[in-house]
Amino acid sequence: MNRSEFWLASNSPRRREMFGWVDWKLNFASSNVDESQYENELPENHVRRLAIDKCKSLTSIPANDFVIAADTIVVLDHMILGKPANAEHAYQTLVNLRDRPHWVMTSVAVRRGDQENPELEICKTKVKMRNYSDAEILQYIESVDPMDKAGAYAIQNKEFHPVVDFGGCMASVMGMPLCHLERTLRKYSNYQETDWPKICQFQLKYKCPITDQVIAGDNVG
């Protein structure tokens, strides 16, 4: 049997970078999905729906190949904080998040080419921001780093280092819960296991407290 290829339905540079950590036969494709939130749609339902829609948006995929899609949202006071529309929006978002806890939710959807409906996982991580100054916010915005990110920040940004504490999956906060992804892929008989837990922790220099539980199938993260 030919080696399966993987199709990542994402424009995210961070997700593409993370998949570069492994020797997979990768294809990248954009998913043209309307990301608007439905009226009265709960944040968790929203992020689940978008991951599914993105995964199903790629068609004509070979039967043994895999489509992977994800969506990430930042939730503060039950409200979704999306990608900033401009610098002023980014500033206000970071002010609202400052010195407060919030939730980052990433949903990942996987389907094989011969499958209509994707398998779905969601990872929810509680994140606490530090008490950064207004001047630090403005300097960070000048770097343009926050402009394409949910919640207007990147947990891995070493200069701004916005996060003071979080519990769980760092990769999920970056946009792809890799252990949840691996757990889902292992359901398929033609998938060759990848040691994502070891690779992820090595790349991020982070000892994940939930990786063993996730791979074991526990409902954590």
Predicted features and spans:
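Anionic-ligand binding patches
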Residues: 4, 42-221
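Cofactor-binding loop segments of dinucleotide-utilizing enzymes, especially the Rossmann-like FAD-
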Residues: 11, 31, 113
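Short loop/helix-cap segments at secondary-structure boundaries that form the rim of catalytic
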Residues: 17-21, 38, 60-61
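Flexible, glycine-rich phosphate/dinucleotide-binding loops
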Residues: 15, 35-37, 117
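N-terminal beta1-alpha1 ligand-phosphate binding loop
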Residues: 2-24
